[in-house]
Each structure stands twice: as C-alpha cells, then as structure tokens.
C-alpha cells in the first residue's frame, strides 16, 4: 500500500488503505480542524522529532470498554487508602510535559514534540482534549491525557512518578466515563500494560463502526470536573 501525501485540504484517505503497520498518510498540519477530522475517522498522528507528520490507523485497534476495566488488588488498595488526590483538567500542560519527559528520561525518545504539545493544548483550550492528574503531597505524581468526541475517549499518553499513580488516574477516568455513558477508550496500539487493564484488540472495521455510532452523541465539551453532575466545571 502507498503512503498518501496530504494536501492543504483537511481530508484523509480511507483508513482501510493504511499499510500493514498502520501508516496511512504523511504531511498536513496539526490544526484543530485536521486533528478532529482525523479522530472522527479513526486516525491519529504519531511521529518523532525531525520526521514529517505521520498519520496512523492500525489494524487491529486496541480499545477498552469501561465495564471491562480490570482493577488489580493493589490498585484497589491504593484507591481505598486514598493515596492520591485525582483531578480532571487542572494541569493539562504539566501532564503533557511530564509524559514527554518520562520517555526521554528512559532513553525512549518521544513523539510528544513541541509542535504536538502546542496542538493538543489548543484542543484542550477548545474543550476537546482533557487531562487526568494524580497528586500526592501536592506534587503531580502521575496522569494521562486524551481527546473526547461523542461517547469515545481517545487516550494519548500517560506517565507516573510514583507507583500506581497513573493507574489511579486511569481508574478515576474510567469511573467518570462510565457515569457519562462513554462507550470505549481508544488505546490505539497493543501494550502489555494496557492489556493488563482490560483492553482488547478489535478489527479496524469493527472499531470504525463503533466510532461512527458513538459520534452520533453530543461531545462532553469544556473543562471536565468530578464535582458536578453534568461533568463540567
């Protein structure tokens, strides 16, 4: 399969045309309009410093159904003991920076390049991108961020500085999404960590059907909060 070169037009080729490794297209930009269009088609950007923008739609796709979230006994104990104070949308920029820094500290390199940080901060300001923060002793101990459209949440990255911090943040996110009738969390690609939390692979065609159905519902847009009934601050 060829890799498609994007033009200035905010459109993408059919995801089914992606290569076997999931790579679909190259180029374009990270404007809010293009990013939202990509997510609505089951496509996401992923590239490293010095590379052009690469757009992916892997097959199979890793997703987590909130009702199938697996909580280990150690995580249950962590939540029961309230080791972390978890918040939503209070430190988006810091969470993104921490996700990038943790990977660099481990020598992994990061795809959260400055251009990507700016793009997702714009989505956050527009009410589409959200962060979950786990705090301990007033310090950011772990967290994650992603994008919300319809009744789908598209996870992007997570980090932890203290044991179980990111899992605690994820557990609170699952509880929040369940309360607001979200249908899935898109985890993108398979990892042992996500599989241990209950994520499962689905054929891309099945994922896209689920995506199209969930986009029929309104997006919970704005700053999220655990304190209000409607989920918004």
Curated annotation (Swiss-Prot):
GO BP annotations listed: protein catabolic process
Enzyme Commission no: 2.3.2.6
Record InterPro entries: Acyl_CoA_acyltransferase (IPR016181), Leu/Phe-tRNA_Trfase (IPR004616), Leu/Phe-tRNA_Trfase_C (IPR042203), Leu/Phe-tRNA_Trfase_N (IPR042221)
MF term (GO), any: leucyl-tRNA--protein transferase activity
UniProt keyword Transferase present: yes
The keyword Acyltransferase belongs to this UniProt entry's keyword annotation: yes
Compartments, as annotated in UniProt: Cytoplasm
Catalytic activity: N-terminal L-lysyl-[protein] + L-leucyl-tRNA(Leu) = N-terminal L-leucyl-L-lysyl-[protein] + tRNA(Leu) + H(+); N-terminal L-arginyl-[protein] + L-leucyl-tRNA(Leu) = N-terminal L-leucyl-L-arginyl-[protein] + tRNA(Leu) + H(+); L-phenylalanyl-tRNA(Phe) + an N-terminal L-alpha-aminoacyl-[protein] = an N-terminal L-phenylalanyl-L-alpha-aminoacyl-[protein] + tRNA(Phe)
Function of the protein: Functions in the N-end rule pathway of protein degradation where it conjugates Leu, Phe and, less efficiently, Met from aminoacyl-tRNAs to the N-termini of proteins containing an N-terminal arginine or lysine.
Protein name as catalogued: Leucyl/phenylalanyl-tRNA--protein transferase
Source organism of the structure: Desulfatibacillum aliphaticivorans
């Amino acid at each position: 399969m060829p890799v498609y070169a994007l033009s200035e037009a905010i459109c993408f080729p059919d995801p089914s045309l992606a290569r076997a490794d999931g790579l679909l297209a190259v180029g374009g930009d990270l404007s809010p309009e293009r990013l939202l269009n990509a997510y609505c088609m089951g496509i996401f950007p992923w590239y490293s410093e010095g590379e052009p923008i690469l757009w992916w739609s892997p097959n199979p796709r890793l997703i987590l159904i909130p009702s199938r979230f697996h909580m280990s006994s150690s995580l249950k104990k962590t939540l029961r003991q309230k080791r972390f104070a978890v918040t939503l949308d209070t430190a988006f920029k810091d969470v993104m920076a921490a996700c990038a820094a943790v990977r660099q500290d481990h020598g992994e390199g990061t795809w959260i390049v400055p251009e990507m940080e700016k793009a997702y901060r714009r989505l956050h300001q527009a009410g589409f991108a959200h962060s979950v923060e786990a705090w301990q002793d007033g310090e950011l101990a772990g967290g994650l961020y992603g994008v919300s459209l319809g009744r789908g949440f598209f996870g992007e990255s997570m980090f932890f500085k203290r044991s179980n911090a990111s899992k605690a943040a994820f557990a609170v996110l699952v509880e929040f999404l369940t309360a607001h009738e979200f249908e899935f969390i898109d985890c993108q690609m398979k990892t042992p960590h996500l599989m241990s939390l209950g994520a499962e692979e689905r054929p891309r065609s099945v994922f896209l059907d689920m995506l199209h159905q969930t986009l029929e519902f309104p997006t919970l847009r704005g700053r999220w909060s655990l304190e209000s009934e409607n989920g918004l601050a």
